[in-house]
């Protein structure tokens, strides 16, 4: 017989197990629904991440081309001096949000694109090519932060999907079948005991009737 639980083969245990099977099957159904919903959410975000990554690659290319043109116009040494004098960006704030019980990051990205006057370098010593390059890299930074949020969300959702899948499989292939096998075993055991009791009572009745007829 397949593997069973170590319980006493009594009617009380039989009733308990039947209740446990119902609860386990309900839990399995809910977990399966959660798993399916998580997978749908994962692929929705995955498509978004792919689109953002393609856009980021494009923007990085544009930014480095703008940087090359700025170098040609003002020279590498002057460009480095300008870069050192740039004001730092605003700080980002990382919070979290809930997606079907999974905590994922929520990054509050401030407006990173700035006016030339907000960057901190003197107009007289720079050029429009430098402004364009700075703007392009600000766009890259903003998109990279958004992509980091999305990819971390994917990572956490993926872990939760695997965790939920293991629980679904454990219930479906181990726990519920084991309980059902145990129920079957107890029912067979109780039926056998009833048959033995029936034949025992029948023999006792026959003996009593034989004595009365003597």
UniProtKB/Swiss-Prot annotation:
Q: State the Gene Ontology BP annotations.
A: proton motive force-driven plasma membrane ATP synthesis
- Gene3D superfamilies named among the record's database cross-references: 1.10.287.3240
Q: Which GO terms describe its cellular component?
A: plasma membrane
The UniProt GO MF terms for this protein read: ATP binding; proton-transporting ATP synthase activity, rotational mechanism; proton-transporting ATPase activity, rotational mechanism
Its principal location? Answer: membrane
Query: How does this polypeptide assemble, per the annotation?
Result: Has multiple subunits with at least A(3), B(3), C, D, E, F, H, I and proteolipid K(x).
Q: Where, subcellularly, is it found?
A: Cell membrane
Q: Known InterPro entries for this protein?
A: V_ATPase_D
The cross-references to NCBIfam families, in alphabetical order and at most eight, read: PRK00373.1-4, V_ATPase_subD
Originating organism: Pyrococcus furiosus (strain ATCC 43587 / DSM 3638 / JCM 8422 / Vc1)
Q: Which domain of life is it from?
A: Archaea
Family designation: Belongs to the V-ATPase D subunit family.
Keywords (alphabetical) are: ATP synthesis, Cell membrane, Hydrogen ion transport, Ion transport, Membrane, Transport
How does the protein's chain sit in the membrane according to the entry? Peripheral membrane protein
* Record's function text: Component of the A-type ATP synthase that produces ATP from ADP in the presence of a proton gradient across the membrane.
Identification of the protein by name: A-type ATP synthase subunit D
